Amino acid sequence: MRFDILTLFPAMFQGPLTESILKRAQQAGRIEIHLHDIRQWTTDRHRTADDTPYGGGAGMVMKAEPLAAAIRAVRAADERPGVTILLTPDGELLTQQIVRELATLPRLLLVCGHYEGIDERVRETLIDRELSIGDYVLTGGELAAMVVVDAVARLVPGVIDSESIVEESHSDFLLEYPHYTRPAVWEGRAVPPVLLSGHHGEIARWRRAERLRRTLVRRPDLLARAAAAGVLTKADLALLAELGWRPETSNGA
């Protein structure tokens, strides 16, 4: 899978994209990550990529000409079809379901917004999708682009063991169960005995129950989505009822 990141600040990506899982995935040829400095497509000697907004107001707006030229050139650099995504607080909220969808694509072009945003005409003509990583505002789209690359890349076949992904938080609208490792007792706190029992069936049931309990406590809004998606079994629903879950209040209100 290929990621193309269009940004005014490529140096921000030094480090995060060359460590840990992303580093190994690139070395193994599972993913490619290409950085593109939008200023390379400016035409003046000052490499101006932004200007004041028409109508007045604070801040600057990313200019249409260099950004459009960058998107078109990067699209043409590889024959694989790609989806052009603008990272912006105005966008659709990124979820694990969207991440799964994006991971099936051969190529993503991630456009990092900055300043007050980009010229609306570029959004209307060259942007396929807009994504946000949360209901807050960052200085630019660079950190959001890193989040998208990390979240999507780990679902590309061969990047992470598939068994590790199955029970991760949000994989089926449920949060992940607690994890423990050696020593068995730390500062007087012991690992749950079931995890030391060697009984795989009991361990699986404990982990499922902990996922349900943790989701109910921390993200009850997810339970309604899990129920609607049909991922909750009769045993799940019975346990949740014992824990006091009522579907009509699962939106967290």
From Swiss-Prot:
InterPro entries (UniProt xref): Alpha/beta_knot_MTases (IPR029028), tRNA_m1G_MeTrfase_C_sf (IPR023148), tRNA_m1G_MeTrfase_TrmD (IPR002649), tRNA_m1G_MTases_N (IPR029026), tRNA_MeTrfase_TRMD/TRM10 (IPR016009)
Taken from the UniProt record, the cysteine pairs bridged by disulfide bonds within this chain are none
Residues annotated for S-adenosyl-L-methionine binding in this entry = G113, I133, G134, D135, Y136, V137, L138
Which subcellular locations apply to this protein?
A: Cytoplasm
Keyword Transferase, does the record have it? yes
CDD domains attached here? TrmD-like
> Mind naming one GO cellular-component term on file for this protein?
cytosol
What is one GO biological process annotated to this record?
Answer: tRNA N1-guanine methylation
Q: A Pfam family for this UniProt protein?
A: tRNA_m1G_MT
Record's catalysed reaction(s): guanosine(37) in tRNA + S-adenosyl-L-methionine = N(1)-methylguanosine(37) in tRNA + S-adenosyl-L-homocysteine + H(+)
What main location does UniProt list?
Answer: cytoplasm
Q: Which UniProt keywords apply?
A: Cytoplasm, Methyltransferase, S-adenosyl-L-methionine, Transferase, tRNA processing
Instruction: Output one GO MF annotation.
Output: tRNA (guanine(37)-N1)-methyltransferase activity
Q: What is its EC number?
A: 2.1.1.228
Transmembrane segments annotated in the record for this chain:
none
Question: Quaternary arrangement and interactors, per the entry?
Answer: Homodimer.
Q: What does this protein do?
A: Specifically methylates guanosine-37 in various tRNAs.
Q: So what family is this one in?
A: Belongs to the RNA methyltransferase TrmD family.
Q: What is this protein called?
A: tRNA (guanine-N(1)-)-methyltransferase
Q: Which organism is it from?
A: Chloroflexus aurantiacus (strain ATCC 29366 / DSM 635 / J-10-fl)
